[in-house]
Design a protein with these regions (language model features):
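Active-site entrance/lid segments in N-terminal catalytic domains of soluble metabolic enzymes
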Residues: 2-218
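Conserved active-site-proximal phosphate/metal-binding subdomains
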Residues: 105-106, 193-224, 229-360
Length: 360
């Protein structure tokens, strides 16, 4: 029987072979945080940097990819994350709910200088996808679902590796059937939006460790564990549980390369394990955040949030304007259960610390 260390070494080797990086570490594609600087820093540290591209229009996405290569080198191995568009069109009930949300937030929007009924739709997925092919990015990451056959075929023809994110064993199997080369599993501990697409919110409330073990056994693909990982012991535990690599998000929030606001970085050391909250106010999906005054006010008001992506369309202009005006009280502050463990250091230092127990 193989020793645990040899089993870990073999699993890690699979991830390194598929991605052509030197350490089994990725950053989470955190909107407004995982920009070119953080992505490139992860690449330089030996991991797979992941650019948060899902909110970028095609031209901005192309420029961001160019910037990653400028900072990390033309041959850098990195991924770009996009979000799969909803499979179903909005219902009349959902649209009515969106109208009520716009009315409820009318005064706030006006205070921020927004025109009445301002919404912001998701960028066009096909146009974004075309950019990734044109730029021949090494790895494509998708969230909120798997890729349809036509997209999988185009990536495979181009020799591009792709991965999806699962919150349950069923979703991991769906991604395997869709042709994914790697599967990220998002434990309930993770910050940001819950990424379930085939499973209900209740079904998707699975812890990282259990989900990692089941997904690795069932899919036989390299599995990347995410959710609540911020220390080297947790990294090794995830690898023992069956992961081939780990993805960290909140652990990088205070890094020099993170574009999180200074006020958010300063509050992180003061948090406890129960400081975060699950809310639907930002996008209609359960999202783990540190509750700003906006979150507290909206949740306590008892408003009925519009379903995803309609709620996101309402909130995106408000969040953008608030950020431009330095309104921290109106911020969206995604953070996982391990956010209080984040340290003020470089991405390279985080990577070295997290990899200290990993046999490579």
């Amino acid at each position: 029987m193989q020793s645990i260390e040899n089993q870990v070494r073999e699993r890690v080797a699979r991830f390194l072979e598929v991605t052509s990086v030197s350490i089994p570490l990725m950053n989470a594609p955190m909107a407004e945080v995982s920009g070119p600087a953080l992505t490139a820093a992860m690449c330089r540290a030996g991991g797979l940097g992941v650019l948060a591209g899902d909110e970028l229009l095609p031209e901005a996405l192309s420029n961001a990819i160019d910037e990653v290569r400028r900072l990390a080198g033309a041959d850098a191995r990195f991924a770009v994350n996009l979000r799969v568009p909803p499979a179903k069109a909005p219902t009349p009930e959902g649209i009515d709910c969106q109208r009520r949300m716009l009315a409820a937030l009318e005064d706030l929007a006006a205070d921020l200088g927004l025109e009445p009924n301002t919404i912001e739709e998701l960028p066009d997925f096909d146009a974004q996808f075309d950019v990734l092919l044109e730029k021949h990015v090494p790895v494509v990451s998708v969230t909120f679902g798997g890729l349809r056959e036509e997209y999988d075929e185009r990536l495979k023809e181009a020799g591009i590796v792709w991965m999806g994110t699962a919150t349950t064993l069923r979703e991991a199997k769906v991604l395997r059937a869709a042709g994914a080369d790697l599967v990220v599993v998002q434990g309930i501990e993770a910050g940001g939006p819950r990424l379930n697409f085939e499973s209900s919110d209740d079904e998707a409330a699975v812890g990282m460790s259990v989900l990692t073990t089941h997904a690795a056994r069932a899919t036989r693909l390299p599995v990347i564990a995410s959710g609540g990982i911020a220390e080297s012991q947790q990294v090794y535990g995830a690898l023992v549980a069956g992961a081939s690599a780990v993805m960290v998000g909140s652990a990088l929030l205070r890094t020099f390369e993170s574009t999180a606001s200074a006020s958010f970085k300063n509050v992180l050391p003061l948090l406890t394990d129960v400081s975060m909250r699950l809310t639907r106010c930002f996008n209609g999906r359960l999202t783990r955040v540190y509750p700003s005054e906006l979150v507290q006010a909206l949740d306590e008001a008892g408003l009925t949030y519009a379903p995803y992506p309609l709620q996101r369309e309402v909130m995106r202009p408000i969040l953008r304007a608030a950020a431009q005006q330095g309104r921290d009280d109106l911020a969206c502050l995604p953070a996982g259960q391990a956010a209080m463990l984040a340290r003020e250091e470089s991405v390279e230092a985080v990577a070295a610390r997290l990899m200290s127990f990993v046999p490579i």
